[in-house]
Amino acid sequence: MIERFLTQTKFTSEDDYAKHLHFIVPENFNFAYDVMDAWAEEKPDKVALLWTSERGEEVSTTFREFKEQTDRTAAYFMQLGIKHGDKVMLILKRHYQWWLSMMALCKVGAIAIPA
């Protein structure tokens, strides 16, 4: 996937890297769609998110599950009236839902304000 966003991926030295590292950023780049959802297509059963609580609880989510959950969350946010360009303060402490909400807000085009 990295080839989609870099003009060159192999370098012979640190100097070569410094001189020739150039990013390709699509005009309407959206990390949630262009990276996370693309990974859901390429490797749907790989772990996208592994979250562990202080009590040792674990939540493991594949890229497919992550895409499905962020799609549903984005639809819910839009149902609430959140739209492209809206600023949304996200207060979820250290819960795994924070990551789902961040990506869902990206999908909506809203501006997430982590708090």
Regions found by a protein language model. Give the residues of each.
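Active-site diphosphate/adenylate-binding microenvironment
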Residues: 18, 22-27, 94
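Conserved AMP-binding/adenylate-forming core of the ANL superfamily
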Residues: 45, 49-103
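Anion (oxyanion) recognition and catalysis
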Residues: 106
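Structured binding elements
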Residues: 109
